[in-house]
Amino acid sequence: MDIPRGNRYRPRKMGDINMHSAFENEHIHGARRFVSEHQFFVGELPQRVTVRLYQSLDRDWIEFEQSHFINTPLQIDAYRTSTPFGDDEDDALHLAVGFCLVQWYQQAVAEGHQPDESWLVPNPRFHNFVERPCSVRS
């Protein structure tokens, strides 16, 4: 059977194992694998921020998602990067934390603005994966 050419998943070798052959289909695109989750506070802001990293399965980069964007008094709107990915995990995490959040916070504080919880704007596309309580049988 011939598979039509086009935009389709091309598996990457991770070690000696071909990853995710289930995605080898012309109708599948944008496949990614969860890598890690990081939670932290920015300066004096009371909300916990979460950053998740994903390995793209058809591109050579690490994607990131943020639970919040930052919108200080120095900005017209909350900063949303147009390139939410890095070359590797370290690069992606530095971009998500340092460039997309902390630099804006530091600049506003340096210019005399008092941190306010309204500076962190929830990302409506970020899903919280809440753990369901487990019942314990005795």
Q: What residues fall within each predicted segment?
A:
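Negatively charged, low-complexity tracts enriched in Asp/Glu with abundant Ser/Thr
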Residues: 2-48, 116-117, 127-138
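Amphipathic, interaction-prone secondary-structure segments
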Residues: 34-68
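Short, mixed charged/polar active-site loops
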Residues: 46-48, 77-79, 120
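A short, exposed loop/beta-hairpin motif centered on an aromatic-Gly-Thr core
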Residues: 67-95
